[in-house]
């Protein structure tokens, strides 16, 4: 066994990983000292097969190594769940950065790598903020927008002013010693240390899993207070440059005006680029492969444009992601949406890892440290105390107008969750040492504040939340009943506000929804995407999906899946579901799903994403059963490689074909079952009629029947159906589309010998015997009758003399699609069919 690798496997990993890191660091240093001959060297050298060019790839190679080290660090941290469940990942990364920074400084005695403001603001911060805005829950964010703005604007100004003035007051007392700091310097430091950092809040609060309202308030405050922070920082920085004697009242008014310009201007830039991105993705149907590129490039351009105009870049990219997510997700393909989602998460996670690790590395630099115990400790005390006071005062004011009150427990978590991070560090590093004499003291204090809030408060916030029993978020999909009631409550509250003449959240949301549906969606979304957003069809699709899962799971539990594997209809109808085994899946299926009116629509893509059952193993087996045995495509799809476009989604074609097949079968079965017509007799009748029609056509000249009265016959015809965007159609797409069912209206001629088409309906035939409808079904009592009104008797022709009240369909342990087998050619009659049938 090699030296230093003794012990268990867990003890084996970290030493080898550390030695590997040290070797990667020392190897370039050792090889980089080799003397490279200059152009003036007269030494003759022969041809070299391999040359070492470290200086040629030094910068990108080091960047790649640091990214690799950060990624490996996350893997090592998550090897032990006990560590990550107690210590936040951000705190672990800072500690790792301190260790790596110590190794680097011990090797060179120079802080070779630090977190610079340029790298942070232009390359690391945008992916994190874009990810937060693109996946922002819009309903929750805009519902609490007033509360978020109050905390972000008033709260940040309160924290900056009170912290700066309090430090200045203590400085005048002489406790801090001899420091060359003025009032404007203290206010400048208070403005940069007062802002809550979005990166730190995301890193800690996502692991705590507090309730959605509390999370969105703290996180929204950390995003939107950027405008206040930038304005205060720029105002006081310019005042320090001018000097306290030259600052006038006009300059103060300009500073207040600049706040509105910076915040509203950054928001407007983000909205404009969001609409531009949505409009571009509307026309990317034939260039699907570059759709994710548009999302990242245009969003990043909004950030750079705002930075170029001295506006709030964080607000710009945040609102760009918020405003474009709905239209972009509807326009781009499924593969592009998946690419955008995972790429954005990867970039945000990687940037967050690098930020915290380099915060630790940057701290290992003796040149930036200036220690003043009184200044550092008082800063920690003031930012904590004034944060709590500001939250309590603002919450007391907000609770007078909020429908859902913020309790004392929520206020404690909000006060304790005011974390500072890399934004404060980057701003303090930007200070000019010639203008701010005590810059190193400000930098040292900021590093201590960041480490204290991220490490200490991050370690203790989870036990605090558990001790206070704060309500946590429920990670589950809302049920259909909850969605329906939520929509009903929204309409009711909107109506109440409209009647009372008040303009509230519900009224504004309703007006915005109408404007979006009538104007924005038509402008920024493709027509096919607008059709797919129909809520009724979405609910119908989800019900069919649950129906399909229950259908296959029931047959699987009975131990017989032969009827699924066999494509023959004869084998399907011979399956007996009269006494199925009770299953637990039926408990999760609603009453509506057990009725005879549902339809099986097997959507494999949605099944993979939305299936939720009791046992994961059963779900897996059901999924593979549906995918392997329940559908056989009509043709083999060609898999072609192309660098410029993606292959068409086969599941989408299969889903649509399955839907049309199923609807055709269910519609025919529903007609035959309802009217008491046997499937075999109906098929035989249609076959005889078609054969007689062919004989008559052969005997008539030109194959045409004399026209008496043209009628339209709506029949089902097999045709190659193209499922594509109606506004964008090409010839080559029509050749690749799979077959389907199309409803066609054909003009036919009625003759004396053949005047009826399709299935005869005895209700509208006066010569038919109506005795079948007067019989009392076995499940009704003679007293359950309903007398129709005189108007009903006049409007309903050839109706039976007595009507029976429709009772609810009885619950059954059968699969919901087993009722389709009612019209099968069986010898014994079904219990729910009439005793006699009529042609």
Curated annotation (Swiss-Prot):
<feature type="transmembrane region" description="Helical; Name=1">
    <location>
        <begin position="57"/>
        <end position="79"/>
    </location>
</feature>
<comment type="similarity">
    <text>Belongs to the monovalent cation:proton antiporter 1 (CPA1) transporter (TC 2.A.36) family.</text>
</comment>
<feature type="topological domain" description="Extracellular">
    <location>
        <begin position="108"/>
        <end position="116"/>
    </location>
</feature>
<feature type="modified residue" description="Phosphoserine; by SGK1">
    <location>
        <position position="669"/>
    </location>
</feature>
<keyword id="KW-0472">Membrane</keyword>
<dbReference type="GO" id="GO:0015385">
    <property type="term" value="F:sodium:proton antiporter activity"/>
</dbReference>
<feature type="binding site">
    <location>
        <position position="505"/>
    </location>
    <ligand>
        <name>a 1,2-diacyl-sn-glycero-3-phospho-(1D-myo-inositol)</name>
    </ligand>
</feature>
<keyword id="KW-0597">Phosphoprotein</keyword>
<feature type="transmembrane region" description="Helical; Name=9">
    <location>
        <begin position="312"/>
        <end position="328"/>
    </location>
</feature>
<dbReference type="InterPro" id="IPR006153">
    <property type="entry name" value="Cation/H_exchanger_TM"/>
</dbReference>
<feature type="transmembrane region" description="Helical; Name=13">
    <location>
        <begin position="439"/>
        <end position="472"/>
    </location>
</feature>
<feature type="binding site">
    <location>
        <position position="403"/>
    </location>
    <ligand>
        <name>a 1,2-diacyl-sn-glycero-3-phospho-(1D-myo-inositol)</name>
    </ligand>
</feature>
<feature type="transmembrane region" description="Helical; Name=5">
    <location>
        <begin position="187"/>
        <end position="208"/>
    </location>
</feature>
<dbReference type="GO" id="GO:0016324">
    <property type="term" value="C:apical plasma membrane"/>
</dbReference>
<feature type="region of interest" description="Interaction with AHCYL1">
    <location>
        <begin position="597"/>
        <end position="701"/>
    </location>
</feature>
<feature type="modified residue" description="Phosphoserine">
    <location>
        <position position="598"/>
    </location>
</feature>
<keyword id="KW-1003">Cell membrane</keyword>
<feature type="modified residue" description="Phosphoserine">
    <location>
        <position position="560"/>
    </location>
</feature>
<feature type="transmembrane region" description="Helical; Name=7">
    <location>
        <begin position="250"/>
        <end position="284"/>
    </location>
</feature>
<feature type="modified residue" description="Phosphoserine">
    <location>
        <position position="815"/>
    </location>
</feature>
<feature type="transmembrane region" description="Helical; Name=4">
    <location>
        <begin position="138"/>
        <end position="173"/>
    </location>
</feature>
<dbReference type="GO" id="GO:0042802">
    <property type="term" value="F:identical protein binding"/>
</dbReference>
<feature type="transmembrane region" description="Helical; Name=2">
    <location>
        <begin position="88"/>
        <end position="107"/>
    </location>
</feature>
<dbReference type="GO" id="GO:0015386">
    <property type="term" value="F:potassium:proton antiporter activity"/>
</dbReference>
<feature type="topological domain" description="Extracellular">
    <location>
        <begin position="174"/>
        <end position="186"/>
    </location>
</feature>
<feature type="topological domain" description="Extracellular">
    <location>
        <begin position="243"/>
        <end position="249"/>
    </location>
</feature>
<keyword id="KW-0813">Transport</keyword>
<keyword id="KW-0915">Sodium</keyword>
<feature type="binding site">
    <location>
        <position position="502"/>
    </location>
    <ligand>
        <name>a 1,2-diacyl-sn-glycero-3-phospho-(1D-myo-inositol)</name>
    </ligand>
</feature>
<dbReference type="InterPro" id="IPR004709">
    <property type="entry name" value="NaH_exchanger"/>
</dbReference>
<feature type="topological domain" description="Cytoplasmic">
    <location>
        <begin position="395"/>
        <end position="407"/>
    </location>
</feature>
<feature type="transmembrane region" description="Helical; Name=11">
    <location>
        <begin position="373"/>
        <end position="394"/>
    </location>
</feature>
<keyword id="KW-0739">Sodium transport</keyword>
<feature type="topological domain" description="Cytoplasmic">
    <location>
        <begin position="209"/>
        <end position="210"/>
    </location>
</feature>
<feature type="topological domain" description="Cytoplasmic">
    <location>
        <begin position="329"/>
        <end position="335"/>
    </location>
</feature>
<feature type="modified residue" description="Phosphoserine">
    <location>
        <position position="724"/>
    </location>
</feature>
<dbReference type="InterPro" id="IPR018422">
    <property type="entry name" value="Cation/H_exchanger_CPA1"/>
</dbReference>
<dbReference type="GO" id="GO:0005886">
    <property type="term" value="C:plasma membrane"/>
</dbReference>
<feature type="topological domain" description="Cytoplasmic">
    <location>
        <begin position="135"/>
        <end position="137"/>
    </location>
</feature>
<dbReference type="GO" id="GO:0031901">
    <property type="term" value="C:early endosome membrane"/>
</dbReference>
<feature type="transmembrane region" description="Helical; Name=6">
    <location>
        <begin position="211"/>
        <end position="242"/>
    </location>
</feature>
<comment type="function">
    <text>Plasma membrane Na(+)/H(+) antiporter. Exchanges intracellular H(+) ions for extracellular Na(+) in 1:1 stoichiometry, playing a key role in salt and fluid absorption and pH homeostasis. Major apical Na(+)/H(+) exchanger in kidney and intestine playing an important role in renal and intestine Na(+) absorption and blood pressure regulation.</text>
</comment>
């Amino acid at each position: 066994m090699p030296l230093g690798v003794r012990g268990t496997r867990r003890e084996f990993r970290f030493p080898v990983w550390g030695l590997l890191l040290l070797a990667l660091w020392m190897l370039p240093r050792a090889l980089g000292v080799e003397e490279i001959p200059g152009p003036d060297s007269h030494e003759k050298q022969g041809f070299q097969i391999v040359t070492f060019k470290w200086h040629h790839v030094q910068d990108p190679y080091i960047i790649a190594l640091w990214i690799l080290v950060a990624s490996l660090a996350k893997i090592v941290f998550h090897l032990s769940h006990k560590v990550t469940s107690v210590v936040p990942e951000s705190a672990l990364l800072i500690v790792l950065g301190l260790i790596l920074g110590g190794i680097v400084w011990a090797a060179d005695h120079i802080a070779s790598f630090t977190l610079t403001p340029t790298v942070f603001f232009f390359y690391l911060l945008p992916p994190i903020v874009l990810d937060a805005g693109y996946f922002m829950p819009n309903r929750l964010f805009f519902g609490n927008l007033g509360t978020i703005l109050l905390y972000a604007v008033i709260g940040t100004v309160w924290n900056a002013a009170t912290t700066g003035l309090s430090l200045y007051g203590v400085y005048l007392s002489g406790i801090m010693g001899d420091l060359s700091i003025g009032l404007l310097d203290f206010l400048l430091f208070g403005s940069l240390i007062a802002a809550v950092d979005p990166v730190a809040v995301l890193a800690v609060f996502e692991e705590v899993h507090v309730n959605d309202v509390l999370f969105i308030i703290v996180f929204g405050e950390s995003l939107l207070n950027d405008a206040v922070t930038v304005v205060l920082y720029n105002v006081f920085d310019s005042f320090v440059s001018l000097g306290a004697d030259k600052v006038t009242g006009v300059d103060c008014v300009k500073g207040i005006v600049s706040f509105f310009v910076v915040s509203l201007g950054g928001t407007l830039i983000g909205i404009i680029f969001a609409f531009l991105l949505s409009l571009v993705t509307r026309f990317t149907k034939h260039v699907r492969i570059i759709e994710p590129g548009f999302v990242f490039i245009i969003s990043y351009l909004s950030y750079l444009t705002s930075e170029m105009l001295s506006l709030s870049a964080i607000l710009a990219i945040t609102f760009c992601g918020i405003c474009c997510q709905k239209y972009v997700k509807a326009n781009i393909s499924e593969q592009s949406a998946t690419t955008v989602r995972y790429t954005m998460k990867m970039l945000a996670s990687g940037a967050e890892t690098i930020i915290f690790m380099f915060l630790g590395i940057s701290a290992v630099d003796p040149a930036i440290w200036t220690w003043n115990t009184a200044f550092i400790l008082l800063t920690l005390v003031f930012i904590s105390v004034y944060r709590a006071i500001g939250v309590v005062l603002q919450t007391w004011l907000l609770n007078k107008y909020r429908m859902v009150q913020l309790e004392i427990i929520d206020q404690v978590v909000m006060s304790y969750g005011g974390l500072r991070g890399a934004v404060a560090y980057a701003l303090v590093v930007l200070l000019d040492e010639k203008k701010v004499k005590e810059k190193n003291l400000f930098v040292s204090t900021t590093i201590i504040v960041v480490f204290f809030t991220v490490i200490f408060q991050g370690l203790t916030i989870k036990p605090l939340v558990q001790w206070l029993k704060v309500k946590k978020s429920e990670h589950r999909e809302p049920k259909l009943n909850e969605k329906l009631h939520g929509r009903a409550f929204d309409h009711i509250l909107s109506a109440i506000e409209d009647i009372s003449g008040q303009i509230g959240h519900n009224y504004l949301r309703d007006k915005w929804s109408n404007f979006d549906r009538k104007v924005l969606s038509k402008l920024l979304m493709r027509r096919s995407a607008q059709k797919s957003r129909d809520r009724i069809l979405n609910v119908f699709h989800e019900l069919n999906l649950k129906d399909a899962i229950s259908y296959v799971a029931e047959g699987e539990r009975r131990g017989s899946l032969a009827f699924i594997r066999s494509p023959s209809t004869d084998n399907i109808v011979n399956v007996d579901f009269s006494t199925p085994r009770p299953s637990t899946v039926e408990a999760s299926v609603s009453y509506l799903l057990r009725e005879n009116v549902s339809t099986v629509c097997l959507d494999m893509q949605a099944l993979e994403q939305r299936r939720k059952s009791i046992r994961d193993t059963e779900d897996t087996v059901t999924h593979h059963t549906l995918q392997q045995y329940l559908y056989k495509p009509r043709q083999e799809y060609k898999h072609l490689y192309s660098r410029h476009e993606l292959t068409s989604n086969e599941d989408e074609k299969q889903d649509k074909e399955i839907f049309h097949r199923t609807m055709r079968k269910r519609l025919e079965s529903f007609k035959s079952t309802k009217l008491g017509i046997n499937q075999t007799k109906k098929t035989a009748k249609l076959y005889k009629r078609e054969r007689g029609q062919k004989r008559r056509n052969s005997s008539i000249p030109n194959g045409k029947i004399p026209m008496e009265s043209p009628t339209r016959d709506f029949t089902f015809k097999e045709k190659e159906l193209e499922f594509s965007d109606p506004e964008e159609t090409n010839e080559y797409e029509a050749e690749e589309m799979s077959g389907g069912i199309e409803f066609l209206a054909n003009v036919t001629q009625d003759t004396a010998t053949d005047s009826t088409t399709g299935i005869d309906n005895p209700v509208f035939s006066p010569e038919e015997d109506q005795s079948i409808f007067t019989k009392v079904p076995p499940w009704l009592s003679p007293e359950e009758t309903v007398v129709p009104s005189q108007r009903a008797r006049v409007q309903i022709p050839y109706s039976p003399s007595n009507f029976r009240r429709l009772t609810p369909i009885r619950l059954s342990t059968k699969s919901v699609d087993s009722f389709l087998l009612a019209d099968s050619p069986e010898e014994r009659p079904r219990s729910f069919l009439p005793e006699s049938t009529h042609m």
